[in-house]
């Protein structure tokens, strides 16, 4: 089976909502992937921040194998031990009493938050421009990207979108009728946009003053991605009412969670919400393996260390196509001086490195949390040539700006 053959089969059977993906991949191990033609790649996409421990990590493989061999699925008509254990472990890392609702994705986790908001009895919600919370209808109503919303109007809910990172705009939008405010601590899909210092603390104060719930969408930033268990923990004085999780939580398996605290934890009651596969024992066993491996192997420290190396290494290149690097931990955006992210993405792939272009001028890095020094060195060593190739593709004159 070749790349061409697998691509043709994909095109003949799957809907076109993604377009044709750029590369057929057949195997992964650690930070490396192989395509159907046998070419090897360094993975800095990580399944879009999903593969927290890389590919085929022994702890995840063992946990999944053991669980599927004993109890694969029973539905939420019955109790299984893995979701209970995972909920307990999550709450330990939050350091707070709360309740957990398990689902299968970030969009579903945010749908759960949407329903919790509705159950307050208040009709209004506030989200941010550029924010991304999923593509199901409730989550899409919260998403602040009109291009994704327009084909599906009208959307549910009374949602006001305000500029991201602007506490004054947020304060003006939140009223006594506001059920919730939902914010990403870092906007990943919008290009790894980091808010100004104090923004989350201001959001907490604004919501507390009006009785609105503060929902933090940590689907992309959570589970160690930024060097903290959850990114809000890097911000003093911020205790959210609801946190939504997915992506890295399952270590490659579909797993999401809506975690609620205080009064928000008691709003969902029997009949209000549910999912057949939520809390699946196999997915939850994988999630428990992910959390325990992060803790046991000290991966939060590794994330911080490799983040500094990557950020410093990229900026030290002094390449005219690089403006700066933003983000936190191993969620980094290389901001370009020109809108050539797509060209950089392709040049990197040609060089055997997979990166992502979420915005025309941003290259996003989301590698595994156990990223090794050798992979970082290989990336930094290849990057100048990748940037040169991208500029040459766009301009035909070698390095951008010369």
From Swiss-Prot:
Positions bound to N(2)-acetyl-L-ornithine: 135, 275
Major localization listed first in the record, in broad terms: cytoplasm
Keywords: Amino-acid biosynthesis, Aminotransferase, Arginine biosynthesis, Cytoplasm, Pyridoxal phosphate, Transferase
Keyword Cytoplasm: yes
GO biological process entries: L-arginine biosynthetic process
Signal peptide: none
Subcellular location(s) per record: Cytoplasm
Family as reported in the entry's similarity comment: Belongs to the class-III pyridoxal-phosphate-dependent aminotransferase family. ArgD subfamily.
Protein name, UniProt field: Acetylornithine aminotransferase
Matching HAMAP family: ArgD_aminotrans_3
Subunit-structure text: Homodimer.
Note: May also have succinyldiaminopimelate aminotransferase activity, thus carrying out the corresponding step in lysine biosynthesis.
Catalyzed chemical reaction(s): N(2)-acetyl-L-ornithine + 2-oxoglutarate = N-acetyl-L-glutamate 5-semialdehyde + L-glutamate
Modified residues (N6-(pyridoxal phosphate)lysine): 247
Required cofactor(s): pyridoxal 5'-phosphate
Pathway(s) annotated for this protein in UniProt: Amino-acid biosynthesis; L-arginine biosynthesis; N(2)-acetyl-L-ornithine from L-glutamate: step 4/4
One GO CC term on file: cytoplasm
Species assigned in the record: Streptomyces coelicolor (strain ATCC BAA-471 / A3(2) / M145)
Keyword Cytoplasm included in the entry's annotation: yes
Free-text remark on how the cofactor is bound: Binds 1 pyridoxal phosphate per subunit.
EC number: 2.6.1.11
């Amino acid at each position: 089976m070749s790349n061409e053959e697998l691509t043709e089969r994909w095109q003949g059977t799957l809907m076109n909502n993604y377009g044709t993906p750029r590369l057929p991949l057949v195997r992964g191990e650690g930070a490396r992937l192989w395509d159907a033609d046998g070419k090897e790649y360094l993975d800095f996409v990580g399944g879009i921040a999903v593969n927290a421990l890389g590919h085929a990590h022994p702890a995840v493989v063992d946990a999944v194998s053991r669980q599927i061999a004993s109890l694969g699925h029973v539905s939420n008509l019955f109790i299984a031990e893995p979701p209970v254990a995972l909920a307990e472990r999550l709450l330990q890392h939050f350091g707070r009493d709360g309740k957990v609702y398990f689902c299968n994705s970030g969009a579903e986790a945010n749908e759960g938050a949407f329903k919790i908001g509705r159950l307050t009895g208040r009709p209004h919600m506030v989200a941010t421009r550029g924010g991304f919370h999923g593509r199901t209808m409730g989550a899409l109503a919260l998403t602040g990207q009109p291009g994704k919303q327009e084909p599906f109007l009208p959307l549910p809910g009374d949602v006001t979108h305000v500029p991201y990172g602007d506490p004054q705009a947020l304060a003006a939008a939140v009223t006594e009728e506001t059920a919730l405010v939902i914010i990403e601590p870092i906007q990943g899909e919008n290009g790894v946009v980091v808010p100004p210092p104090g923004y989350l603390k201001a959001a907490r104060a604004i919501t507390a003053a009006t009785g609105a719930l503060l929902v933090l969408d940590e689907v992309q930033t959570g589970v160690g991605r930024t060097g903290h268990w959850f990114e809000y923990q890097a911000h003093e004085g911020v205790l959210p009412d609801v946190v939504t999780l997915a992506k890295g939580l399952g270590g490659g398996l579909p797993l999401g969670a809506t975690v609620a605290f205080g009064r928000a934890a008691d709003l969902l009651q029997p009949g209000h919400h549910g999912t057949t596969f939520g809390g699946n024992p196999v997915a939850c066993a994988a999630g428990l393996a992910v959390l325990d491996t992060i803790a046991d192997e000290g991966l939060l420290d590794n994330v911080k260390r490799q983040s500094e190396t990557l950020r410093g290494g990229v900026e030290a290149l002094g390449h005219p196509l690089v403006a700066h690097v933003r983000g936190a931990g191993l969620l980094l955006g290389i901001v370009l001086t020109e809108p050539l992210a797509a060209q950089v993405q392709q040049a990197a792939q040609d060089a055997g490195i997979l990166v992502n272009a979420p915005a025309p001028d941003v290259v996003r890095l989301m590698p595994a949390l156990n990223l090794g020094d050798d992979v970082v060195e290989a990336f930094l060593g290849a990057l100048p040539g990748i940037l040169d190739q991208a500029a040459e593709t766009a301009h035909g004159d070698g390095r951008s700006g010369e």
